[in-house]
Amino acid sequence: MQFKLAFVSIALATLAVATPAPRGEPASSCSTGDLQCCNTVEPASSPSASTILGLLGIVIQGVDVLVGLTCSPITVIGLESGGCSAQAVCCTDNSNGGLISIGCLPVTL
């Protein structure tokens, strides 16, 4: 019994160490929406994001959803020239006039 517990503990520790850290997706994998260049990307629960969401009357399920603040679309021309000096993201909801984009994932250009 103790051998099983030790084996399981070692296996879980090895798995935790061997699991790679999440990184930004490549820009070519943006299948949920348009590429955006956002000044900041933060959790929806952050003070600035929650204030903007509240003012717009937007309710988000889950506080760990990433939102982009002050975003603009990245065009093909902008992509070729590295046209985003802030945070490039792929967001599921860009319908708020660039003020806030919802459901964002960081991408690498």
UniProtKB/Swiss-Prot annotation:
Gene Ontology cellular component terms for the protein in this record: extracellular region; fungal-type cell wall
Keyword terms: Cell wall, Disulfide bond, Secreted, Signal
Cystine pairs: 30-90, 37-84, 38-71, 91-104
InterPro entries the UniProt entry points to: Hydrophobin (IPR001338)
Subcellular location: Secreted; Secreted, Cell wall
Signal peptide bounds: 1-18
Entry-linked SMART domains: HYDRO (SM00075)
Residues passing through the membrane, by range: none
Coiled coil: none
GO molecular function, one term: structural constituent of cell wall
Domain of life per record: Eukaryota
Function (record text): Aerial growth, conidiation, and dispersal of filamentous fungi in the environment rely upon a capability of their secreting small amphipathic proteins called hydrophobins (HPBs) with low sequence identity. Class I can self-assemble into an outermost layer of rodlet bundles on aerial cell surfaces, conferring cellular hydrophobicity that supports fungal growth, development and dispersal; whereas Class II form highly ordered films at water-air interfaces through intermolecular interactions but contribute nothing to the rodlet structure.
Subunit structure: Self-assembles to form functional amyloid fibrils called rodlets. Self-assembly into fibrillar rodlets occurs spontaneously at hydrophobic:hydrophilic interfaces and the rodlets further associate laterally to form amphipathic monolayers.
Protein family according to the UniProt entry: Belongs to the fungal hydrophobin family.
Protein name: Class I hydrophobin 2
Organism: Lentinula edodes (Shiitake mushroom)
